[in-house]
UniProtKB/Swiss-Prot annotation:
Protein name: Leucine--tRNA ligase
Organism the protein comes from: Rhodopseudomonas palustris (strain HaA2)
Reactions it catalyzes: tRNA(Leu) + L-leucine + ATP = L-leucyl-tRNA(Leu) + AMP + diphosphate
Phylogenetic lineage: Bacteria, Pseudomonadati, Pseudomonadota, Alphaproteobacteria, Hyphomicrobiales
GO biological process: leucyl-tRNA aminoacylation
Motif extent ('KMSKS' region): 630-634
Family from the record: Belongs to the class-I aminoacyl-tRNA synthetase family.
Amino acid sequence: MSNERYNARESEPKWQAKWDEAKIFATRNDDPRPKYYVLEMFPYPSGRIHMGHVRNYTMGDVVARTMRARGHNVLHPMGWDAFGLPAENAAIERKVAPKAWTYDNIASMKKQLQTMGLSLDWAREFATCDPTYYKHQQKMFLDFLKVGLAERETRKLNWDPVDMTVLANEQVIDGRGWRSGAVVEQREMNQWVFKITRYAQDLLDALETLDRWPDKVRLMQRNWIGRSEGLLVRFALDAATTPAGETELKIFTTRPDTLFGAKFMAIAPDHPLAQAAAAKNEKIAAFVEECKKRGTAQAEIDTAEKQGIDTGIRALHPFDPTWQIPVYVANFVLMEYGTGAIFGCPAHDQRDLDFVNKYQLGNTPVVCPEGQDPLSFVITDEAYDGDGRLINSRFLDGMSIADAKEEVAKRLETATLGNAPVGERKVNFRLRDWGISRQRYWGCPIPVIHCEVCGVVPVPDKDLPVVLPEDVSFDKPGNALDHHPTWKHVPCPQCGGKAQRETDTMDTFVDSSWYFARFTDPWNETAPTTPDVVNRMLPVDQYIGGVEHAILHLLYSRFFTRAMKATGHLGLDEPFRGMFTQGMVVHETYRTADGHFASPAEVAIVAEGDGRRATLLDGGTPVEIGPIEKMSKSKRNTVDPDDIIGSYGADTARWFMLSDSPPDRDVIWSEEGVKGASRFVQRLWRMVNDAAAIARSAPAERPATFGPEALAVRKAAHGALDKVLSGIERLAFNVSLAHIREFANSFGEALAKPGQPSPDLAWAIREAAVILVQLFHPMMPHLAEECWAALGRPGLVSEALWPQIERDLLVEDSITLPVQVNGKKRGDITVARDANTQEIEAAVLALDAVRQALDGKPVRKVIVVPQRIVNVVG
């Protein structure tokens, strides 16, 4: 066997230069071949790529290279999600301009990505912070504005008085801003929103068509959209207990069948009725203020202790006006959900039960499980939310839940309060319109002007883009655009009078909600898309990214595609045909005696008995080996891709990232695993060189017949070809790599046999070597190019078409059949695939297991189901 070592440091830059020179990854929009668009979620230019990037982009590259080899016109672009808060933080902390910081990071990360050997069309590269990109985003905003998909509305928002910006609910922790630590205020503010709720039902229904998306992602979106059918019920308020002017309280419920179990009403702290009550009661006012300080993220509200205060207001039961229900202000009701008010039926809702137990309001069960005695059915600490029959509900008693819901709806639809029905059937959605206003500098400017005379005036198309000024100062907190002395002051486009630009910028999720469409023709200077091109190249056939983007990014992109269709920018509804969410890259953590984390590069690990011992390389101090966690800077358990690529080569890193775990699961980083991948690279190199020496003696023409040895080599090669391709098509990359290893093992055995191979075997070895190189090319393209050249093949393997599978070679010569005696399995038998019935019968009856099962009884008949099963009847 050859002892020559493969030198990745020399090979990889050489082949990358050849690919660039030949422009083999550039995609032509007019290419007549069937298109295939593969896209990994583009990165934020933080400054360095991490191993998660390596895994993500390697997966996409395997798909791109495979589909290119199979004759598709592959679009595989790359760009930069370049706006965002970290650039402003860098400007504040390091006194560097956001633009300069961003583009320096892009240059560094691009260089890193290029060392990975990714088959990207860099000619289509753009950054979302470039005015040539956001010019078109501003144009689409104005188009959305014209058709009512963008609006300005007043919302109650979380305001950080130190950072002077609006915070999302998830950014408020224990009532304080996640970054500044300041107590967050609730402020009513003007906010630009996209009307995503207009498409709520369509976005929900279309999830059924996305059969190449993970079920968990579709479920997350389904829950986020949150469609519920129910009843809007208007409760009259007792005039004697209610502030002047308040006459009714509206609630939306999906369980109108439980109305007779109502024990309290709960309203949000910012509900108008709560505000009216607080104006006349200091205790209520104090409770409302305390609620404003709490976190507003749904997860935090769900886990917080349920608290409330009785307003003294009483609501009247819609079926019995003598039945008064106390109205509480509660910390678990949000104004933005439903009507900002609920009725509590504690017997059948755990949250409500916890609440009434705390305030001793009691509970009355109104749904009894089938078979349970209604008289003895009680609720104490655990609510019952199952099916059953109605009890303690007057005219509903004995009904099923479904029938009771219908009966309540019918009665309340015909009852009136004032001049309107008490009840109204409604479909409610949890989904809320998308607020896009951000009080930040480093984002896409919103292209509107505010005039005291004309109001909100769109920036004329001819004046786009509205470009961010570069001479900004971050000496003051808040939005640098607000402080700019000249940028925001402009004449009104309509009346010419004094006016001001909108100083809010767009949520960065807007930038990433249409970038996939821009990649189809990023050279179009006059429009966001070129209709015939975008409609031909979209949807993205395979999108790859983290599950953390399952809701917001993916849902916003689905909305944006519909909005772009409504405004004439493209002609389809769904942006991504296939979606794949890869797992994370995880690593052990290491902690010193003083509690500080140590990086893997600072730690030495040795085996000790049945375990392992870790020490610091510098000084030998013992280190605690901690749990395996996601790689993060805070835990210092990251591995620098540059170090791995510099030591082992990009192909080794790529192979390891694909081989160790199913791609949708986390991969545990292991230095031993990387070394194993490196050894396999060297083994393949030696193997191909050995095969190349044999191939030089092979006949040019295909032999007319093949002997057993040659046939075995060919069967293994074509079997691997079939299995590896199947794995890639299913994105089961680890399975494909296992089949490559399996084939390499059998091929290595064939190469190791002594003596000069026969002409037919030499021909088969040459064919198998070519197939082997093409099989690992998508995963290890640099090694594949070097091996391709060693085999004397013309051109580049990156341009070669996938080998044709000879299906007749996939048929096994023998087949294994299960054998039953009187319907009970007794064993298996392996026979020639073309064996006739008589031969199979004879072989079966000769089996010891069959003779023992018959125990001397005569054979009545033998039933042979061809290539399926044999049953002996005795």
